[in-house]
């Protein structure tokens, strides 16, 4: 969601450091989360920004936009509302610590900054992982932290399939019906 909102802010030529203008823009925007073909999507004023969520310009500015406290309030409420309406898996940097702190199944998926940068490069993306990690962990509003009851999975040496298998294994151990 934060990437979608960042894209929207940039599309409207709003300076990502102008908190007041960002808030004004978002408070008048219609942000919808829905499911289509069993896939979640975000629409902002009826536009689906999915193809732009990993654009370099979004990568460069997402931490600036997402650290605005009112932006976080708006989006956290949207995510909580969506979770109340649907059974779902939600991923994000503060899902287990801020958005859904009471969920019984929390995983903190991580990898070394070097591996994450390599993965992004293979996907054709440029992202300053270490810079973004520092910005996200030091922001005042919802800083990046590992929830105290989250299970940490270091994926540095794992394939996507192995990560999925590990999550399923841990869910089964917790009694989740799979």
Whereabouts are the PLM-identified features?
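ATP-dependent small-molecule kinase phosphotransfer cores
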Residues: 2-86, 99, 114, 126-131, ...
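Small-molecule kinase domains that catalyze NTP-dependent phosphoryl transfer to phosphate-bearing small molecules
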Residues: 34, 79-86, 93-103, 122-167
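Structural signal for conserved beta-strand scaffold positions within catalytic alpha/beta enzyme cores
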Residues: 48, 108, 152-154
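A short beta-strand-to-loop transition that corresponds to the Sensor-1 phosphate-sensing loop
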Residues: 92-93, 111
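Conserved AAA+ ATPase core "coupling" helix
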Residues: 111-122
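C-terminal alpha-helix
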Residues: 166-174
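ATP-dependent carboxylate-amine ligase
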Residues: 176-178
